[in-house]
């Protein structure tokens, strides 16, 4: 009887391993295909947009989704430089993860345990989060974020990652993407954004629901000045240089 129980447990463990392995394979194949499709097809809606719409419905403050997709060549080079300066100085150099920035952020957070935490998410990581995942702060979500970051860096070009980032990122209540933001705040298309306007929009990205580029607080105004000072020194993507 005892031997039969042990044998039965081993059989169950074997079946569980097979099921788990099968699920992992299906998950990889499915997500690989989705990321590959988005290399060529622009997403209509993202998980974050769905969450924001649901939040608006339940709070009776529905603002809808304001979004207009624009190819990277119809977005001002100033905006590309502004987000690289603001969010990810080594965007063109890393493979999705800026280990130097991660170490620096970890050291800073250790020294300022009671202050505001500094993040080190790259533009690639933010794109993975914005396009594929629902917003949360769990380690599980971080794990999926790293996984999708690996996939988009593997399958997409840096140009496509930047294009997706600038078209899907949240830039205000109900505002997604740089074209909608440019029209909302400055009443101009994204391709006509000046350095100052681009830096002002980039400065609100850490807290787009609480900040406004037209009414910057002291911290945001300081950030705008810092971004402007960095824009001329960041490495310019080749697609920007070709478009000039």
UniProtKB/Swiss-Prot annotation:
Task: Please write the reaction equations for the catalytic activity of this protein.
Answer: [GlcNAc-(1->4)-Mur2Ac(oyl-L-Ala-gamma-D-Glu-L-Lys-D-Ala-D-Ala)](n)-di-trans,octa-cis-undecaprenyl diphosphate + beta-D-GlcNAc-(1->4)-Mur2Ac(oyl-L-Ala-gamma-D-Glu-L-Lys-D-Ala-D-Ala)-di-trans,octa-cis-undecaprenyl diphosphate = [GlcNAc-(1->4)-Mur2Ac(oyl-L-Ala-gamma-D-Glu-L-Lys-D-Ala-D-Ala)](n+1)-di-trans,octa-cis-undecaprenyl diphosphate + di-trans,octa-cis-undecaprenyl diphosphate + H(+)
Q: In which broad location class does this protein mainly occur, judging by the first location in its UniProt entry?
A: membrane
Pathway given for this chain reads: Cell wall biogenesis; peptidoglycan biosynthesis
Return the Pfam families for the record.
Transgly (PF00912)
EC numbers listed for it are 2.4.99.28
How does the protein's chain sit in the membrane according to the entry? Single-pass membrane protein
Annotated disulfide bonds:
none
Determine if Cell wall biogenesis/degradation is one of this entry's keywords.
yes
Domain of life of the native organism: Bacteria
Query: Got a GO cellular component term for this one?
Result: peptidoglycan-based cell wall
A single Gene Ontology MF term assigned here is: peptidoglycan glycosyltransferase activity
EC main class here is transferase
Query: What Gene Ontology terms for biological process does this UniProt record contain?
Result: cell wall organization; peptidoglycan biosynthetic process; regulation of cell shape
Family membership noted in the UniProt record = Belongs to the glycosyltransferase 51 family.
This protein's name: Biosynthetic peptidoglycan transglycosylase
Protein source organism:
Cytophaga hutchinsonii (strain ATCC 33406 / DSM 1761 / CIP 103989 / NBRC 15051 / NCIMB 9469 / D465)
Gene for this chain:
mtgA
């Amino acid at each position: 009887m005892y031997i039969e129980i042990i044998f039965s447990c081993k059989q169950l463990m074997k079946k569980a391993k097979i099921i788990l392995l099968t699920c992992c394979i299906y998950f990889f194949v499915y997500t690989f295909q989705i990321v590959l499709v988005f290399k060529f097809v622009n997403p209509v809606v993202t998980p974050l947009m769905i969450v924001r719409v649901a939040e608006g419905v339940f709070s009776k403050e529905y603002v809808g989704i304001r979004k207009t997709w624009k190819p990277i060549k119809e977005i001002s080079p100033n905006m590309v430089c502004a987000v690289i300066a603001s969010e990810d100085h080594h965007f063109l150099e890393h493979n999705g993860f800026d280990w130097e920035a991660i170490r620096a952020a970890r050291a800073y957070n250790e020294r300022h345990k009671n202050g505001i935490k500094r993040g080190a998410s790259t533009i690639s990581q933010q794109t993975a989060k914005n396009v594929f995942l629902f917003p949360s702060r769990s380690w599980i979500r971080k794990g999926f974020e790293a996984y999708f970051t690996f996939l988009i860096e593997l399958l997409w070009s840096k140009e496509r990652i930047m294009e997706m980032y600038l078209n899907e990122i949240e830039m205000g209540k109900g505002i997604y993407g740089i074209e909608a933001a440019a029209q909302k705040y400055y009443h101009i298309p994204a391709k006509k954004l000046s350095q100052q306007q681009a830096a002002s929009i980039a400065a609100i990205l850490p807290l787009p629901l609480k900040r406004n580029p037209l009414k910057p607080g002291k911290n945001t105004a300081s950030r705008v000045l810092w971004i402007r000072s960095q824009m001329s020194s960041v490495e310019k993507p080749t697609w920007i240089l070709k478009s000039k």
